[in-house]
Amino acid sequence: MSNTILQHLPIGQKVGIAFSGGLDTSAALLWMRQKGAVPYAYTANLGQPDEEDYNAIPRKAMEYGAEKARLIDCRNQLAHEGIAAIQCGAFHISTGGVTYFNTTPLGRAVTGTMLVSAMKEDDVNIWGDGSTFKGNDIERFYRYGLLTNPSLRIYKPWLDNQFIDELGGRQEMSEFLIANGFDYKMSAEKAYSTDSNMLGATHEAKDLEYLNSGIRIVKPIMGVAFWRDDVTVKAEEVTVGFEDGVPVTLNGQSFSSAVELFLEANRIGGRHGLGMSDQIENRIIEAKSRGIYEAPGMALLHIAYERLVTAIHNEDTIEQYRINGLRLGRLLYQGRWFDPQALMLRETAQRWVARAVTGEVTLELRRGNDYSILNTVSPNMTYHPERLSMEKVENAPFDPSDRIGQLTMRNLDITDTRDKLGIYTHTGLLTVGKDSMLPQLDKK
């Protein structure tokens, strides 16, 4: 068994813990200190929409026994990784055309690298977090952590039988904190769990594991419950501007940073519940899970970006962009966003697709994912309506005789195709006749 993963608490050694301030990490930090480890707490500011006071979290960590507690601002890096994912179309999970924008995998890529980098500055080479052995995050953090620090070892309280025996549930953890003088009140038990960052929110587990429970039990944290009749959602026009593949304006307004642009995109999309989806997906270990997702800003920017992509690039480029995006989305989901094969796909899309994407798209947003595109403007468009106008135009790029030649040359294989179908009929692979899909094939 690998000695990278520690199954028992390393007594007397520095242990970095990704500290959220919630019940699990609070109890784990105090427990590790009492058992003889030297815990260091690291909190990632990812712009979580449900977090009210980031600065209070390190103070809480110190109260629970942290040797040192640091707040790491990850928002700028997260915003740029989100833009990179949009530029590459790095999204492989969708249902009925509604996309999951890989917001949790993007958050883990940033958290895993930036927190471990901060730990290295403090000479902390053991890392713990709250991910369980059944999920994706345990593998994502493992990869990003070791990628950042090859000397890293990993200790997870939730893989330590002693911790599980003593503090195996929420009730036990709450009682442990109270017994040690902390007035910890458990929050009301929700029907599902939520994890979020600035790019999106994930709702899963508990009642949402049952497919007869759906979006109607979820209380959105980034927008409105658009499915409810008592929620008023007014139609709204919004114009998104891109320069060289980078979103730069919303309704003509520029922003001081990518973070500020994302926050405004979230506000606009959130007013409509844009970007919410219900997905059944394959986890890394090939077992299926179910999640309900929010990503209002990502959805808004993605729609506008893809509209410009289709207006600017040719069919083969768009096809390759989509194929590469599906593959890159899987790599991102698997915790391989910074692997060479992912960087190769990213560079291809960002250089040869995104660089040409300059322009503005105006949309009307309604309820949920209901929207219309009202206008598309770009100096780089290869869409020229006069080429295919149904009206008579002067200096037309081609005439009827040109099309006759194209039809002849482009379809020389019709005879070959008919002969092949005849072979399939002769061998019994196809049946001809009145009720078959090729009823006239046997007629010469």
From Swiss-Prot:
UniProt binding sites for ATP: 18-26, 44, 130, 132, 137, 195
Keyword terms of this UniProt record: Amino-acid biosynthesis, Arginine biosynthesis, ATP-binding, Cytoplasm, Ligase, Nucleotide-binding
Superkingdom, taxonomy of origin: Bacteria
EC main group: ligase
Catalytic activity as recorded in UniProt: L-citrulline + L-aspartate + ATP = 2-(N(omega)-L-arginino)succinate + AMP + diphosphate + H(+)
Gene3D superfamilies noted in UniProt: 1.10.287.400, Argininosuccinate synthetase, chain A, domain 2 (3.90.1260.10), HUPs (3.40.50.620)
Compartments where found: Cytoplasm
Residues at which L-aspartate binds: 132, 136-137
Keyword Thylakoid applies: no
Keyword RNA-binding assigned: no
Pathway: Amino-acid biosynthesis; L-arginine biosynthesis; L-arginine from L-ornithine and carbamoyl phosphate: step 2/3
SUPFAM superfamilies with a match to the protein in the record: Adenine nucleotide alpha hydrolases-like, Argininosuccinate synthetase, C-terminal domain
Gene Ontology biological-process annotations: argininosuccinate metabolic process; L-arginine biosynthetic process; urea cycle
UniProt EC number: 6.3.4.5
Alphabetized GO MF terms: argininosuccinate synthase activity; ATP binding; protein homodimerization activity
InterPro entries, A to Z: Arg_succ_synth_type2_subfam, Arginosuc_syn_C, Arginosuc_syn_N, Arginosuc_synth, Arginosuc_synth_CS, Arginosuc_synth_type_1_subfam, AS_cat/multimer_dom_body, AS_multimer_C_tail
Positions of L-citrulline binding: 100, 136, 140, 193, 202, 204, 281
Recorded GO CC terms: cytoplasm
Recorded family membership: Belongs to the argininosuccinate synthase family. Type 2 subfamily.
Record text on subunit structure and interactions: Homotetramer.
The protein, known as: Argininosuccinate synthase
